[in-house]
Design a protein with these regions (language model features):
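Terminal, low-structured helical/coil segments at or just beyond the last alpha-helical repeat
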Residues: 106-139
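N-terminal alpha-helical interaction modules that lie
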Residues: 1-33, 129-139
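Short coil/turn linking the two alpha-helices of tandem helical-hairpin repeats
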Residues: 11, 15-18, 36, 48-51, ...
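Residue signature of alpha-solenoid helical repeat architecture, marking inter-repeat boundaries
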Residues: 1, 34-35, 69, 106-109
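Alpha-solenoid helical repeat scaffolds
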Residues: 7-8, 38-43, 73-77, 93, ...
Length: 139
């Protein structure tokens, strides 16, 4: 069975049969480990969205980062950190790795596209996080 099918089944069973669903997700993860970083990102999203397990989600993202070997892989992980997990520090680390791996004009175009899409999100996350801390200090 393909890992994507396992992810779908895990999502469907998350509320009714959580133990079985976790088993399926772990199988999907073991397959995704040998594939592309995007596959581990999907596993991370499943852990977060259906099981509310942030630790396993972050572990999957770290695996995706470790298995990335090119600009597009690191940018995909950076995008996941920003879009789904709202973590600008980890996104920046992946972005810097993407910069280091950039070798040609296509890589530089990917980086420019990433910046165009995610610079506003990064600023918003940092502003929200700062407001959150300010709010807590004022209470």
């Amino acid at each position: 069975m393909r890992y994507s099918q396992l992810l779908v089944q895990a999502a469907e069973l998350a509320k009714t049969e959580p133990e079985r669903a976790e088993e399926l997700l772990r199988k999907a993860e073991s397959i995704a480990l040998n594939a592309y970083p995007d596959d581990m990102i999907l596993c991370a999203r499943c852990w977060e969205d259906y099981f509310h397990n942030h630790d396993n989600a972050m572990r999957c993202l770290l695996e995706a980062e470790c298995r990335s070997s090119n600009t597009s892989g690191f940018l995909a992980v950076a995008a996941a950190h920003l879009r789904h997990f709202h973590n600008s520090q980890l996104a920046e680390r992946c972005y810097n790795k993407a910069l280091e791996k950039a070798t040609d004009s296509e890589d530089h175009l990917r980086i420019q596209n990433f910046l165009s899409e995610f610079a506003p999100a990064k600023a918003e996350i940092e502003t929200t996080n700062n407001k959150g801390w300010s709010h807590l200090k004022n209470d």
